Amino acid sequence: MEAILMIGVLALCVIFLLSGRNNKKKQEARELEDYLEDLNKRVVQRTQILSELNEVISNRSIDKTVNLSACEVAVLDLYEQSNIRIPSDIIEDLVNQRLQSEQEVLNYIETQRTYWKLENQKKLYRGSLK
């Protein structure tokens, strides 16, 4: 009788130990899954940062033939496709501005075109000639 009781107690101890190990393995698996999820989030963040940096680099890269950045050349190509001529003064000023995005370049050119249009519409005051 005592032998059967001892075998039963040993069986319960073995089951308890195995279930404890199983719980530890489940806990470790959950921790590893959380760690993997955190690493995946970091990879996504780093990929976004890398793509933003690559975009900035491509916008800042200078075309050696015309001495303008890629975004400036793209905007000037849009004007050329639309058969709109840009005065050389605006292009010369554009070289010195070093604008970062195509929208900034477009806004700058439009502002300068408006300014030059107003300047060219000025007339000489009639009273100045005598």
UniProtKB/Swiss-Prot annotation:
Upregulation: Expressed abundantly in the early phase of the viral replicative cycle, especially at early infection times.
Site (Involved in dimerization): R113, W116
Coiled-coil region(s): 30-60
Membrane-traversing stretches: 1-20
Pfam annotation, one family: Phi-29_GP16_7
Primary location: host cell
UniProt membrane topology term: Single-pass membrane protein
Subcellular location as annotated: Host cell membrane
Record region (DNA-binding): 70-130
Site (Involved in oligomerization and DNA binding): N120
Gene3D superfamilies: Phage phi29 replication organiser protein p16.7-like (1.10.8.600)
Quaternary structure, from the entry: Homodimer; homooligomer. Interacts with DNA; one dsDNA binding subunit is constituted by three p16.7. dimers.
Protein name: DNA replication protein 16.7
Native organism: Bacillus phage phi29
Lineage start: Viruses, Duplodnaviria, Heunggongvirae, Uroviricota, Caudoviricetes
Gene that encodes it: 16.7
